[in-house]
A protein has these predicted regions:
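Pseudouridine synthases involved in rRNA/tRNA modification
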Residues: 1-17, 27-28, 136-139, 156-159, ...
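Short phosphate-engaging motifs
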Residues: 82, 110, 172
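Short hydrophobic/aromatic beta-strand micro-patches
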Residues: 76-78, 102-104, 167
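Glycine/acidic-rich beta-strand-loop module
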Residues: 54-92
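A short, Trp-centered hydrophobic/proline-enriched beta-strand micro-motif
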Residues: 97-100
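Glycine- and acidic-residue-rich catalytic/RNA-contacting loop of pseudouridine synthases
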Residues: 27-46, 103-162, 178, 221-223, ...
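A structural signal for short, hydrophobic beta-strand segments that form beta-sheets
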Residues: 8-11, 62, 147-150
Length: 253
């Protein structure tokens, strides 16, 4: 997947009510800053000018969020009623989301549930970060749970890494990034949660791979192509398969 440009938006699903895009890494969904001209919103407006809704600030209704650094499936509602039906699915926890990631080190357990509560870091210089309960300066930690399933052990630029499937069972800011870091396996390229050490990869290796939203009118079920394959990035070399991606996704349904 190449870096985002104004005219290379990738569409995974489209109906009269919804569009699901494959968001590029290092791309904001929207921005009020005049100098940030390339956003997902501007890509959508360029590709679908006739679908922009003048009654909304950004022109499009984003059903959920993805971090600036995270790529993958993101759902956009094309009208108010569709947005409401998607919002209800998220509120009622009917949505299934699964992410692919490369994490540092070889994860020894084939599966794990990570249940650290996560709060906002109020320490000076770290106020843009989240943290697990018990960290100095951790404010208002809330219960969080993530499932981690090991897919492959391998290496990235010669260093040991593990390819994992991550399923957030709650929806806290930076949850997957914080949880991976908290168990000693930060996401490859995550500068923020690697004590500002991991700066050499070209991107953070976190990708929203699978999204299922069972709205009353239609079932949205998409996969955003896996970017963590050797044909896409020769720095990643898988050595040993632990779980099949296809079988693991089938278990989520």
């Amino acid at each position: 997947m190449e870096p985002g440009t104004i005219d290379n938006l990738s569409i995974l699903y489209q109906s009269s009510d919804f569009i699901v895009v494959n968001k590029h890494w290092d791309l904001r969904i929207d921005s009020k800053m005049w100098y940030e001209t390339l956003t997902l919103q501007s890509q959508l407006k360029y590709r679908f000018p006739e679908l922009a809704d003048p009654d909304t600030y950004y022109g499009f209704r984003f059903c959920h969020q993805l971090d600036f650094s995270t790529s993958g499936a993101l759902c956009v509602a094309l009208n108010k009623a569709a947005a409401g039906s998607a919002y209800k699915c998220f509120k009622d926890r009917l949505v299934t989301k699964a992410y692919l990631a490369l994490v540092r080190g070889h994860v020894s357990q084939s599966r794990m549930t990570i249940s650290y509560a996560i709060g906002k870091n109020t320490t000076e210089g770290m106020t843009h970060m989240m943290c697990i309960e018990g960290t100095e300066g951790c404010e208002n930690p809330k219960p969080c749970q993530s499932e981690l399933i090991v897919l492959e052990h391998g290496s990235y630029s010669g260093d040991p890494v593990t390819k994992v499937l991550l399923q957030p069972l709650t929806g806290r800011t930076h949850q997957l990034r914080v949880h991976c870091s908290s168990v000693g396996h930060p996401i490859v390229g995550d500068f923020t949660y690697s004590h500002k050490q991991d700066s050499s990869p070209y991107r953070m290796m976190l990708h929203a791979y699978y999204l299922r939203i069972p709205t009353g009118k239609e079932l949205i079920e998409v996969r955003a192509p896996d970017p963590f394959v050797t044909s896409m990035d020769g720095n990643w070399l898988p050595h040993h398969v632990v779980h099949s991606l296809e079988e693991t996704i089938q278990e989520l349904k």
